[in-house]
Amino acid sequence: MDFGIVTAKIDEIGYITHAENLGYSHCWVTDSQMIRSNCWAVLALAAQQTRRMRLGTGVNVPGLRLAPVAANGIATINRLAPGRCFIGLGTGHT
């Protein structure tokens, strides 16, 4: 069984590293622009501070972010955490 964590703020990065140390396998970072931290910045910091945890958005809202910007964001995270990233797409704000 896998366990994951959801976070939204860059100052909660300690939760992500603690969750990895406890054996959590995934981290989803919400993409709520203007409300929470930039998801790509949080994921980049998490990529630097974790070694095994899979990292991605939960969820990226296509109607609020241009596709090339989202593609560049996840590609950058993949460079920092090769093979450990994913992108969740959806309507968000639920």
Region locations from a protein language model:
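Flexible, glycine-rich active-site loops centered on histidine and acidic residues
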Residues: 1-5, 64-94
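N-terminal beta1-alpha1-beta2 module of alpha/beta enzyme domains
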Residues: 1-58
